[in-house]
Amino acid sequence: MVVSGEIETPVVPASTMTQVTFLNKTGRVDVLCEPGESLLQAGLRHGLELPYACGAGVCGTCVARSKPNTVENLWPNAPGAAQLNAGKGECLLCQGAALKDCEILVPAKIDLSRLSDQRPARFEANLQDVKVVAPDVATFTVRLPETVRPISGQYFLMRPKGMQGFRAYSMTNFDESTDALHFVIKKVAGGVFSGKIFSGEPLDEPLEAFGPMGLATFDPSDTRDLICLVGGSGIAGIMSILAQARRVDHFSRHRLFMVFGARRIEEFFFLDELADLARTHPDHIQIHLAVSEGEAAGDTSKDVRGLSVHHGFVHDVAKSLSRPGEFDGGLAFLGGPPPMLNSCLALLLEAGLPVSDIRYDRFA
Amino acid sequence: MDELAGGGLKRFEVAGIVVLATRVNDTTRVIPPFCPHMAEPLIESGICSGATLTCSKHLWQWNLESAEMQGAAEKPLIFYPSEERDGELWIDASQELSYQFDEEDDDDFEW
């Protein structure tokens, strides 16, 4: 066990509820934490607008400070913890759990006097309907014991029993109120969760789910054209956004420019859904497929379900297919591995899109 | 200077000190290799578009020409003194520059 602060001494994890006081110059808020519950999840449950992005130890956004021997570090080697100053008691809210009643100093820019209406919650959920939809890619459904009201583009943190940390998965569906959440997962070498999903064994053990979370969301009253640049399973949250945009008939008035990338053509999935969407407003919707390996594509004979196939990385294909001013005034959603995100971000910034109009989750 | 012609950030080592250099219009800028926010290595996360440098980690931005912060940035970049002489970039790296990564406004907070 590693404890934030200067001194590391053996400590016993709390077996009962603890009271954590989040504080800074804007105020003090007391929150009750379940044993072993992360400070972030406890604070968000309470409605605090704490800083976070991935919620899973990767991005390092949720840095706060604790006093020595008060907080257990649930994942000492978290990538997001690499730059923490342990001497000053810095910890990640998403990877810290209170060992006893304690105080947590959060960044001064967080207004602790405000409480959010949208409060994520913790559920014991059931995993259902696993379907392999492409090599090393599967979809699955998580059934919650009660309905939730997610915003399109949001994600849930999930953890099967026996797995140490939570992982973030974006919903692919959108319903204003639902107890059935649909997800997509890529097989990861050595991955505990994906190993279970792809094992073919019955998934009868409940899993822990926490959400909905995430700020890379779509407001159905938005009146901008949409730009979606995605790779592989990074398409998940974008499918939810497209579902809601379709439901409010966004594309009868606004355009969609989308490039979906995979290494090989057989690795694509959700093509029926995308082709169906493209047919609803062909004058306004462009959806292209980008294949980064294999033979050059781009001629219409290589079209798949009416979606044009092009050779190259997502950002290259987006650049070559976009007309001057294509991205002006648009709202962009990105999803995929970090190198793809960076390349697409560079493309959109070069095109003059402000960062405030580019949304994505930093899961990796 | 030719190495900076293609734009973007270029990594150099000067007297054992790693720096990143970039050229925007007629201005050459030399900075420490880390983002002042959370020490992200800018050679990987830094994106130059026009005069703007963006760290893709948390989308902090700076104008490299004016040295002003943009958007979400809360701390300024710091620059090594440098000048161009006969097509070569000279950098004053007599002292390694680094950022203070602590939350200054938290340091005087009474727990």
Where are these regions (language model features)?
Chain A
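Reductase modules of NAD(P)H-dependent flavoproteins
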Residues: V2-G96, D101-C102, V259-A364
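A short, basic/flexible loop-to-alpha-helix module at the beginning of a structural domain
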Residues: G211-D222
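Ferredoxin-reductase
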Residues: L115-E205, R224, A262-R263, A290-G294
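Short, surface-exposed secondary-structure boundary micro-motifs
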Residues: K67-T70, P107-K109, K161, P212
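Fe-S ferredoxin-like electron-transfer domains
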Residues: A81, K88-T141
